[in-house]
Amino acid sequence: MKSASCRKTLFWNLMATVGLLLIGGVPCAGQSNSIGSVGSAPKTKIILDTDIGDDVDDAFALGLALQSPEIEIVGVTTAWGDTALRARMVRRMLLEAGRAAIPVAEGIVTKSPTTFSQARWAEAGPAAKERIDAVEFLLSEIRKNPGGLTLVAIGPLTNVGAAIERDAATFRKLKRVVLMGGSVRKGYGDLGYEPDRGPMAEYNIKCDVAAAQKLVASGVAIFMMPLDSTQLKLDEVKRDVLFHKNTVLTGELAELTAEWGHNTPTLFDAMAVAYAIEPKLCPVTKLRIEVDEAGFTREVKGEPNASACLESDAEKFFRFAMPRWMKPTAPAK
């Protein structure tokens, strides 16, 4: 007879398979998933700039990047608040994924109004052997890859603003910035079930308005994932499927969600990573965006300076992301 623990493991493995079928994550024999399939295309080189450790969606975003073979993570830079502790958290995730060789650079330290909810988990991560400055790291990597590097910015834009201030000409040599930030036509909690609340001052923008203003004026191609398209709820069914899949990453995400202390994560930041891999997941509209002093991203008349995703299909997103989060961790060779 199988032990109770063995029967429980078999049960949850079965539930994970059923869950993937329900969300469309497992293609039938002879079929392929046209979104996110890996061909012979060169890898997308990214730097991820993140305020990981407050809300839990940054961890899901980093996990998605680590589990996506289409991406080469050139480095991770930490933004806002206690950037050294955030860097320890990133190093721990990379170490446990077998990806410790990825550079982690510490950004500009600031005061933060937000609680570092996952600090206890982060404190178990390794400290830096030698501190790498995030702003200089970003500019150095752009110089090495002119026109070939994507910056995925999923936190307040302090490091970005400092890089523009330090060397705007080099910053303009980025291929693009994929930004989780802003609110163009919809705000927080606007999920289509009640009258529109209208745009709001979104957190990543309002934390450092001056930096956001520098970015939209920089001349770099900006692909903006605002609140309009990123309020993606990881509901109870998906959480049960994901957190009972016994892998390194799913274990981390379960622990971090528990430390975060709320029931249902909204995976704002994961959409920015998903877009960097597969733009079909969040079709964009060219707009002219201005950032006002209150942190609103205003849609105004004039020559477009950004491409914004104003609507997304949550089901397609989760069909893309869930199988990646759930697959066994495969360290880069």
Predicted regions and their residues:
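Position-driven detector of the extreme protein N-terminus
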Residues: 2, 13-16, 323-327
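Bacterial N-terminal signal peptides
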Residues: 12-25
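Generic hydrophobic-segment detector
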Residues: 9, 14-15, 145, 172
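N-terminal secretory signal peptides that target proteins for export/translocation
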Residues: 1-8
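N-terminal acidic, glycine/proline-rich low-complexity segments
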Residues: 28-333
